[in-house]
Amino acid sequence: MAQGWAGFSEEELRRLKQTKDPFEPQRRLPGKKSRQQLQRERALQEQSQKFGLQDGSTSLPPEQLLSAPKQRFNTQRPYSSPPTPLTLTSPVGDGKPQGTESQQKELGLKNSHEVHKNAEVLPLKADCQLEKKKVELQEKSRWEVLQQEQRLMEEKNKRKKALLAKAIAERSKRTQAETMKLKRIQKELQALDDMVSADIGILRNRIDQASLDYSYARKRFDRAEAEYVTAKLELQRKTELKEQLTEHLCTIIQQNELRKAKKLEELMQQLDVHADEETLELKVEVERLLCEQEAEARKQVVHLERSFQPSGESVTLELAKENKKPQDQAASPKVDEQGKNSNSIALLDPERPNQEVETAVKDISASLIT
């Protein structure tokens, strides 16, 4: 109804002016709408058609709609003339009632008032409806834009939340896997450390024990080495002393034999006894035997020295030393006694020089062997 109405025509306005009540104050009629208002109304109508509005109805719930402003209509009644009696008697004496004319005038005035009121109320209602539609369309367009933006934001937020939840789940799984891997590696390293620490402890204990044994053995070796050196020096001295004594013995025997030979020659010259070849050969043989026995005695002495050398232990060295001392002490008086006996025998019995020499050599060799 509001879409087809475009305002009053000029004839209607003229007729309304003519039928206007003179007693009612003049009201300002709405003028023609400008081009901008018409374009705005058309845009609002197109927008309402686009959003599916029909006859001002909206798709929003009633609690979301804005309340329309209440229009105040001017319902003042025109000043009416005081009531007059319906029947008036004219002063003229014809006696006809004059109330019909006044009634007709009142009816005409009432009709004109009603027409004027209807003409004023119609454009006011149309303007109110247009304003309501404009406000509703504006509110609806804003509300729908806000709703669309809100929906888009909600969808974006949902997607972001889903992505965040997915990323958090992946990160949590990854961190759990990494923590499990790190724990496993830590356990393996701890096991290796425990094994290595146990092995190291055992080896350290063994090394300590071995170092103690080594120090004890080193001390023993140092003592044995010192004893060996001292024993070797002592042996060298004893060996030199023995060699000197044997050489002295040999020289004594040789000189004794020379004295015996000279003595025998003197005796033979005094007795005028000539030595034959047999005696000379016997003398040569005796000298050879003496030399051989002397060489054998020396060899035996060397062999005994080698047999009495230390084998690395101090006990054997001490025993050898203890055994050598009485032997040397016993051998030296025996040799002296044998030399003395041989000299005395040779002097007493000069006829048996060979037997005395042989016995002396045998005694000396026996003493050296023992």
UniProtKB/Swiss-Prot annotation:
Subcellular localization: Cytoplasm; Golgi apparatus
GO biological process: non-motile cilium assembly
Major subcellular site: cytoplasm
Segments for region (Necessary for interaction with RCHY1): 185-370
InterPro entries from the UniProt entry: GORAB
Coiled-coil regions, chain positions: 142-284
Basic and acidic residues bias locations: 11-27, 349-361
Stretches for region Disordered: 1-106, 320-370
Key word Membrane present: no
Cellular component GO terms held in the UniProt record: Golgi apparatus
Keywords recorded for this protein, A-Z: Coiled coil, Cytoplasm, Golgi apparatus
Pfam families associated with the record: Transcrip_act (PF04949)
Highest rank taxon of the organism: Eukaryota
Membership in a protein family: Belongs to the GORAB family.
Binding partners and assembly: Interacts with RCHY1, RAB6A/RAB6 and SCYL1.
PANTHER family xrefs: RAB6-INTERACTING GOLGIN, RAB6-INTERACTING PROTEIN GORAB
Name by which UniProt lists this protein: RAB6-interacting golgin
Species assigned in the record: Bos taurus
